[in-house]
Every structure is written in structure tokens, then in C-alpha cells.
């Protein structure tokens, strides 16, 4: 447990103690700090005029020092085992020999585990459970109306309001995660256990990624339900692309991503490499863009995180005022929801996703949460229905 006045400064200080090479067959990861960053860490970014309400039930940040790890290559069905060798203390030869012994031990463990363990059977289909929201639909729609009034008054262009659904039934988090992999596969699948707290999810969206000094943001904004047939799905994509509200919302968040990166990028290096493309997910279709930039030489990985946190797609724009309005209108601090999950590597890489499509399991209360972007012409009922669509893939996994 680390106590410090600035969590982002702590990350810099800690990471500076270690350096490791990169091995492409492992992807970008080669050991580092891995965990979650709660939304309420925005209080420490320096962006806000005053602190927002902060979750007191769960840590603001949980990071694990990962120096032994296993990589699985899906394409070639191959496992790689890695361990870090520390050369700052004692004999390098001795450290190397200990590392080899460690690798052999892990190899034996993997072989024994694969030969003696099978995944539990999970039915192919299940009915979603009723969602126990902490606010009623009418209460949420009233908050949407209040946000619209503030937007009409010029306070903001967009505000992302979320709803929380409690998990009141006993659920095995690991079985939930396995089912989630089946029904809602996403670019980022994660299962993290820290004491009696488990955070697991299937996030579709990068928060920020850094590799070879290139930072990437990938705004996802604009949503429509999946069609039941290929023809209907194609039609839904056309409807989404023709929806002026969804296009305006998406463009606003692409501009916000460009602005976030411009603060930490070399002049002229910010580029939109993909713009407003419809992408299929298990239950919805999203509009997706890709924004990249070359980092300024003086920028550290925690600087990148600090200046992009939290993501504009979970706040709205302008970001600071949207965060203040969210704090005013939502009934409880967001906590883990809408922060990010991922790693900061010893090889100067970082890969994080936004903590959405995520379940939090803990004795203090287990929940799901999702949001919708509110703009001047939002229809409150439609925004509520969007949240229900986003949570559907999670809720069908809950009976497990």
C-alpha cells in the first residue's frame, strides 16, 4: 500500500527504477505496473477547479508489480513464459540462473494445469436478469433534462450521464468473466483480483496507448443496436451514419481527443488516421475514430495518462465543465467506473482501456454501470434505452 500526495508522480518515480528491453513476440508488454485507475483520480490531474466527490469504498488506484508473466499467442496457439532479471544487486550470473529455474517451475505448472483442468461448462444462451438501477428511469430522465438545460444555457456541449445497476444475486466473478468472453468479446478483456475486490470487463475502447513514442486515442461515440439480420445490420449502420446528433457528438469527441494529445505531442504530429467508421460489437454498433500523435521528448508515461484522463467519451465536452456537471447530477461518485485499466511497462510502453462494460465485485457492493452522451437535442427515453443496450451483454452473463 503506497501513500503519496500525487499518484501520477508516484508512477513516474516507481517506473524510473526499472528498464527492460522489448520482445515483439510478447507484443508490447514486457513487465511493469498493471491494474486500474479510478475515475476519481481526476482530482489529482490538476484539471479541476475543485475536487469532485470521491469514492471511499475502493482504492483510487491499484497497481501490481508484474515481473513474471505468461503470454498466450492466439494465432499460433503458443505460450511464452517470461521473468524479469534484476541486475542492480548481486551477481548477474546468479540472477540469470535463478530466472531459468523460475521459468522451469512455471513451465511445469502450466503443463500440469492444462492436463488436469478444464473450463466449466457454460450454457450457450441465457436470459438477462432484471437490472436493479440505483435510480429509476424517471429520475435518470429528469437528470437528462437538467443536463440539457445546462447545455442550452451554454455550460457545456455534451455531458455523459451514467446509471449504476446493483448486482444483488450471488455471482462467481470468474465464471461471469468466462461467460462474458463468449457473449461480448472485445479488444480488451480483463479479470483483476485484489484481495476481496474483483474488477472484470470487456472494454471496446482504448483510453490511451503508447508504443515507440506514438500515443493513440480511439474515441468511440455514436451507438445503435445490432440488427437481427445482415441486411438489417447494414441498414442500422446507414441510419447511424446519417444521424446528425450521433455524428455531431462523435466529431466533438474526436476534437477533444486531438486537443488532449496536442498538449503532450510534438507540434504538427497529431493526426486522425480513421474517422467515424461503424464497427460491430456483440450487441451494438459504434462509430469509431483513431487519433495518434508523436510524444514530446520531455513527456513521461504518467504525463500522457494525466493529460488524457479521464477519457472525453465518458465525460463530455468541454471536459472540465462536463466533469463538474456529472458530479452535480449523478447520485454517487463513479469510483472505478469510467477510469481505465491496463499497464505501464518497464520498456516505456503503455496500454490502457476505458473501464466500461465492466463489473465490480466487492463486499462493499457489486455493480454494473454505463452512460449515454447528452446533447442539446437528446431525447431522455432514448438515452435511457442506450444504457440498457450497453448493459445487456453484461447482464446475460450475471447468472453465472
Regions found by a protein language model. Name each.
Residues 1-400:
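Extended alpha-helical targeting/anchoring segments
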